[in-house]
């Protein structure tokens, strides 16, 4: 095996695959080297590949603990511990911090632990020991392990159920039928030119009495408010958040309090505009966005004066939502505000890869300063996400109240747009030098290129799978079931 093949094996880049005719195909060294380059690994020649292998092995042996250990409930919880042979260590102490806040402590003699592997890095010998910890409850926990020499580290412990939850109607074997809809395509005489969350509630109210147990939806992921012509739900800006064009504007509580918004919507020219938006066979996304954002900005101004400045219960509900969503939502709202700001300066700014260099890093001082100086612009997009989340939550609540066996069935796209907020907020995870697709088959003899940057699986593990956890958590928050677009991507990705 040459160095490039060995390096590819270490980083999980396949050497072969089965084509659609069930014939084995080899992946060329050039393709393997290109994929490695996309994840930041130099494999241009044998010498570079050998150096990269050495670096990989050095990190593997010199790190005391892996970043994360995942087990299913009932399985032994075994943590590998890498210890230098020349280190005069006798004991280790461990402390588990449970997800709920309590802690548990223990200790072990190193000479009583099983040696599972031996190796070396930079002329120093190591042994990998197997530390078995007590069985833990479901959840995300943290273990701190310290040797008596002072060397210490942390590992995230993920204890997962053996399978996904099934509602009683499914687990009992009952057959459940439902409908699948593209929400944007729902028509009504009151919406503003595209299906919205009130239309979804109306669909639930009509379908539930007929025995419908599930309503399947297209991905509802956040797109780009400043570029409403970017319409594909399968190329979203951020899969953790929602497309705010689905907000039913007149159902927002602030609409009833905002005289300016009500007068504007009631105006003859605005009503004529809404009727025009409802008429075409295809959704006029640009027109819908213009109408909705015109009124939503008025509602935000009213919300600020009536609630944020008065610290009302509605203000507290908004603040709680923002706090719950945390840094991920703050960065998404910052991106939307920045994107809107820069697009006003010209078409050369079509997404973060085209932004001035300093703005491409979400932690850069210029970005932090922008978020501080344009705080209300950022807060406006936080507000929109809150409105969308509340209306989707109400739709699922309606499904439950009306006795649907399951309720809303959400959809998670396979990836995020290369110029959107999800990739901007975590550039180390997404590899812009490659794109996701599918191998050749009978319908696409040249294969498919979906134009979506893949995640680096090694970086995902380094980040303790937190991006995946956040993705599933946020998408399950307001639905009862979830479809992962291309579930095979949990195992492999073309």
Annotate the PLM regions:
Residues 37-108, 114-146, 159-426, 460-461:
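Acidic/aromatic-lined carbohydrate-recognition and catalytic surfaces
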Residues 148-154:
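Short acidic/polar inter-strand loop motif in beta-rich domains
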Residues 5, 33, 204, 396, ...:
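Short glycine-/small-residue-rich flexible loop motifs, especially phosphate/cofactor-binding loops
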Residues 1-60:
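Long, contiguous interaction/targeting segments characteristic
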Residues 405-466, 471-474, 492-494:
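Substrate-binding/active-site clefts of carbohydrate-active enzymes
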Residues 381-402, 463-494:
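Active-site neighborhood of glycoside hydrolase catalytic domains
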